[in-house]
Amino acid sequence: MICLVLTIFAHIFPSAWTGINERTFLAIKPDGYQRRLVGEIIRRFEKKGFCLVALKIMQASEKLLRQHYIALQDKPFYDRLVKYMGSGPVVAMVWQGLDVVKTARVMIGETNPAHSLPGTIRGDFCIDVGRNVIHGSDSRESAQREIALWFQPDELVCWQDSAERWIYE
């Protein structure tokens, strides 16, 4: 119940999602799921010290995907992207931690895998921009919008990470 209240509070006061409480939305795309990269991707974020507060495997509807990628609706690849994202299971996740939005983007790598450094998810596992394994929110604002789009407030789990004192000063 406390978690639900905190989540609703965070929707009303976005500044509540800062510091070690910052949250981001990540989605392992159908290619990442089919290639069995889910465990490896989760492992990387856990080893970094971030907390997984929500996860679900789902077949995303066209309506959800069109809302999710609304900012890209004028791009020539928009319909192809929506069709591709609906072609198989997606692993939707919410991660929490200090500067998680920015750090997750660094860990993921560039949108075009050819520009991604080794050690990043896309640098290690991707070749083609159209099959780049994972989506990550690009700002706190988009993270809040995407989390609200993919998850109900009661699906976000608040928990105290016993390793937190070993991660944050």
Curated annotation (Swiss-Prot):
Q: Which residue positions does the secretion signal occupy?
A: none
Where along the chain is ADP bound?
K29, R105, T111, R122, V129, N132
> How is the protein disposed in the membrane?
Peripheral membrane protein
User: What EC number(s) does the entry state?
Assistant: 2.7.4.6
Give TM segment ranges.
none
Q: Which GO terms describe its biological process?
A: CTP biosynthetic process; DNA repair; GTP biosynthetic process; mitochondrial fusion; nucleoside triphosphate biosynthetic process; UTP biosynthetic process
Q: Which residues form the active site?
A: H135
What's the main place this protein lives? mitochondrion
Record keyword Transferase present: yes
Top EC group:
transferase
Q: Which Gene Ontology cellular-component terms appear in the entry?
A: ciliary basal body; cytoplasm; mitochondrial outer membrane
Q: Which UniProt keywords apply?
A: Cell projection, Cytoplasm, Cytoskeleton, Kinase, Membrane, Mitochondrion, Mitochondrion outer membrane, Transferase
Q: How does it assemble?
A: Homohexamer.
HAMAP family with a match to the protein in the record: NDP_kinase
Q: What the record says about its domains?
A: The N-terminal hydrophobic region (1-17) is critical for mitochondrial outer membrane targeting and phosphatidic acid binding.
Functionally, this protein is described as follows: Catalyzes the phosphorylation of ribonucleosides and deoxyribonucleoside diphosphates, other than ATP, into the corresponding triphosphates with ATP as the major phosphate donor. The ATP gamma phosphate is transferred to the nucleoside diphosphate beta phosphate via a ping-pong mechanism, using a phosphorylated active-site intermediate. Through the catalyzed exchange of gamma-phosphate between di- and triphosphonucleosides participates in regulation of intracellular nucleotide homeostasis. Required for ciliary function during renal development.
Q: Which family does it belong to?
A: Belongs to the NDK family.
What protein name does the entry list? Nucleoside diphosphate kinase 3-A
Question: In which organism is this protein found?
Answer: Xenopus laevis (African clawed frog)
